[in-house]
């Protein structure tokens, strides 16, 4: 099986599933049908409390286990295809932020590969065995860009700025005529979690109310909430201020957004879609939003299949 897993700081994404980047140990065994995994004798269940930000995700096994959990979900969904196969061969496609890709790619690959040894685990108290036949590491954000690049003919532009508003960081990279510019790749430590903290503090200070991240998401997505209009209005004001500051910071980095085509990707970009439209008026340039939280995963697959086709021709 070919399986892609996007290991975000806030959410884990696979082809068919999205869940929080959080796990916790459960002392009791996983029950039949319970959403949890047992690996090396330790029981883990999903937790909405995300993992503390890790610059290097290979520091410990948590992202390995979260990835295994994502794989388990996909294996269960593909039950008819894998039934009776014993050890299931898996080609794993994962990604790293643009700023970390060059220096961490090999280490991240080895983190999952582990000499291709068979991996035994229980998911929902059901046994599985997999072996990684291959592990490919791709560049996040650029992978999402590839989904729309051909359709929108972005390769014809001299400057396309990809902005990935993620959980802890905002990753960006410049693409010129379809080619990534290695000197214009970096991360800004101002991801959407920064916005959550600002809004939480501001609302608590002015209205003595506590908004958690789900509350803020619901407000910014304009879902029905029980909060007063003044709370909603203030939340949007703070989100707009955050976005204005974020986009303004690119000029300090030597990037004039007015002279680029911007492509927004990532869950934070989707959350701020309406505000991006409102703020973008001042830039008077083209922009696109990839409105798909699983875009990176699909981009991983697109690149892998292209590599496969290329190798078959040689």
Task: Please tell me what each predicted stretch does.
Residues 1-160, 179-193, 214-217, 221-264, ...:
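Nucleotide/phosphate-binding catalytic cleft detector across ATP-hydrolyzing
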Residues 202-206:
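Conserved AAA+ ATPase "sensor/coupling" helix adjacent to the nucleotide-binding pocket
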Residues 171-174, 184:
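Short, acidic (Asp/Glu-rich) active-site segment that either coordinates a divalent metal cofactor
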Residues 207-211, 215:
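Short, basic interhelical loop/turn and adjoining N-cap
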């Amino acid at each position: 099986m070919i399986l892609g897993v996007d290991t975000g700081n806030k959410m884990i994404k696979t082809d068919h599933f999205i869940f929080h980047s959080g796990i916790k140990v459960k002392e009791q065994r996983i029950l039949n049908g319970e959403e949890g995994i047992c690996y090396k004798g330790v029981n883990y269940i999903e937790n909405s409390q995300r993992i503390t930000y890790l610059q290097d995700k290979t520091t410990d096994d948590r992202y390995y286990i979260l990835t295994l959990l994502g794989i388990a979900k996909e294996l269960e969904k593909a039950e008819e295809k894998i039934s009776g196969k014993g050890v299931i061969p898996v080609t794993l496609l994962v990604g790293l932020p643009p700023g970390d890709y060059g220096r961490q790619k090999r280490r991240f690959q080895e983190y999952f590969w582990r000499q291709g040894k068979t991996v035994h685990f229980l998911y929902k108290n059901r046994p599985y065995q997999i072996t990684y036949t291959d592990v490919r590491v791709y560049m996040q954000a650029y992978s999402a860009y590839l989904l729309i690049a051909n359709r929108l003919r972005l390769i014809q532009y001299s400057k396309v700025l990809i902005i990935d508003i993620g959980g802890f960081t905002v990753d960006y990279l410049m693409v010129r005529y379809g080619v990534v510019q290695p000197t214009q790749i970096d991360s800004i430590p101002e991801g959407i979690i920064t916005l959550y903290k600002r809004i939480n503090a501001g609302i608590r200070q002015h209205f003595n109310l506590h908004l958690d991240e789900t509350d803020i998401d619901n407000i910014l997505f304009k879902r029905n909430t029980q909060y007063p209009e003044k709370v909603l209005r203030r939340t949007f004001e703070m989100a707009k201020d955050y976005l204005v500051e974020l986009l303004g910071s690119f000029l300090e980095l030597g990037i004039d957004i007015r002279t680029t085509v911007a492509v927004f990707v990532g869950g934070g970009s989707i959350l701020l879609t309406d505000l991006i439209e409102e703020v973008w008026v001042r830039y008077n340039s083209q922009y696109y939003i990839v409105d798909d939280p699983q875009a990176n995963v699909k981009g991983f697959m697109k690149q892998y299949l292209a590599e496969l086709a290329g190798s078959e021709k040689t």
